[in-house]
Amino acid sequence: MTNRLSFEMEKDLLIKGWMSHDARWFMAVAERFGIDAANRLNQLVCRELGRVEMKRYMKTLGLSPAKDLEEFLILGKAALTLYGSGLAEYEIKTLNHQTYEMHLKRCFAYENIVRAGIKDQYECGILARIQGWIDAQGLEHELAPPLGKCMMVLGKECRYSITLHFH
């Protein structure tokens, strides 16, 4: 074979493959057990996946948990680039020494639930994954608003305020 994939092409294919698996898993659970069960399990699995992938990421790079918001945001942005490249467009705004706001301007999950025709029943799993990244660092946090229905479906901007409690 003469054509070789670049690293970015390989990463893109792996991410898209995983997201295809994720969507099909969600729909299979929804069809078999109902949308409420699919939402509950999706949030649980996304949070646990986030915890595991952040622990693995930190171990691979020899990193310790973040000591302050600046370190946390640097680590989070790097993880988003690795695990979610091209899946969302977002802005991060620091509100104070322990709180930041995440504004998702474009979200693959929203785009896919609209295509799948389940937008009115879907509950956000994206922020659950980020909560897992927080859990992996042993941090307590507050999320406002709490997870629930997709904010974009509700006609709102997808904005979450996350307050971290560093030790």
Regions found by a protein language model. Name each.
Residues 122-135:
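A conserved amphipathic terminal alpha-helix motif
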Residues 1-99, 108-124, 140, 145-167:
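N-terminal accessory segment detector
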